[in-house]
Amino acid sequence: MKQVVYIANSESKNIEVWNLCKSGKMNLIQKIETDGKIQPINIIQKRNLLYAGIFPDNKIITYSINHNGFLEKKNESNIPGKANYISFDKKKEFLFCSSYHSNFISVSPLNKFGIPQNPIQIIYNIEGCHAAKMNYKYNILFVISLKEDCIYLYYLTDFGILKSTEQNILHTQKKSGPRHIIFHPNQDFIYTINELNGTIDVWKIYKKNNVIKVKNIQNIHVLKNRFLKDYWCSDIHITSCGRFLYACDRFFNIISLFHINQNDNKLVFFKSYDTEEQPRSFNINSHNTHLIVAGEKSNTFIIYSISNSTGELKKINVYSTGQRPVWILIHALC
């Protein structure tokens, strides 16, 4: 299966498309201008569409992905503020846009061609709304408020309207600054990375008396035995096998590996690796064989191989990219 890598370079105002070989060797195959600074990108695989959040004009550009991974611009859709995170519902009928700077989450229907329409709902006053992601098993959108140290929970109705759950808010530690979120493949466990205090929270989601509950079961530092005053954590991802979790910090320029306990799904710190300067974004391929980290300040990205048995990372190569790479995705072509 052919793989391509998309890198969003904010200051260069472009998306680079790289071919990824099984060996880990990479080569640049396309560079497409975005008519503005770019931040989040995301893909709907079954539609072969890539969505990019652009500012300062505040819009989402939709690109088609051809059989070789090349991008072609299809449409522009206006949004009410700067996009920081893009995600979708399970059926890929709605697009959720988080805005850290404008403090909102918006819901935009996708038409039959996958093009975002005008938002049908905007929820304001979510301070520092850095990310929102749907738990497909429980039909709950987790909306992260970095500045409030909390996570809001919303059900998604059939018409795309969000409504608060019975337990409508999760509180993280004070001044922790929750930033990004991932789900275990079984969807029963949630992992959130806290930007400001250098920790990861582990949450369990379950039903009790036919009501969905979420409880915190662990808080663990991204650096073992280093409890410092300043952190600047950024991204978090889990392998599709559910055995390994990775998290990075931009202040220390590291990426840490955790093993996931197969009995309770809590995290066990394993190892940290020095990586590219200011690692804002990284991604894991669908076969769990490679991990790529983009250095926002170094304007480079590094590709590692992943050990199938331990999750350990082994450097393959470092490549130069555009100015200020802020988002990276690995896409398997159908």
Swiss-Prot record:
Q: Which InterPro entries match?
A: 6-phosphogluconolactonase_YbhE, Cycloisomerase_2, Lactonase_7-beta_prop, WD40/YVTN_repeat-like_dom_sf
Biological or metabolic pathway of the protein: Carbohydrate degradation; pentose phosphate pathway; D-ribulose 5-phosphate from D-glucose 6-phosphate (oxidative stage): step 2/3
Reaction(s) this enzyme catalyzes, per UniProt: 6-phospho-D-glucono-1,5-lactone + H2O = 6-phospho-D-gluconate + H(+)
* One of the GO biological process terms: glucose metabolic process
Q: Which GO terms describe its molecular function?
A: 6-phosphogluconolactonase activity
- State its Enzyme Commission number(s): 3.1.1.31
Q: Which SUPFAM superfamilies match?
A: Putative isomerase YbhE (SSF101908)
Q: What does this protein do?
A: Catalyzes the hydrolysis of 6-phosphogluconolactone to 6-phosphogluconate.
Regarding protein family, the annotation reads:
Belongs to the cycloisomerase 2 family.
Name the UniProt record assigns to this protein: 6-phosphogluconolactonase
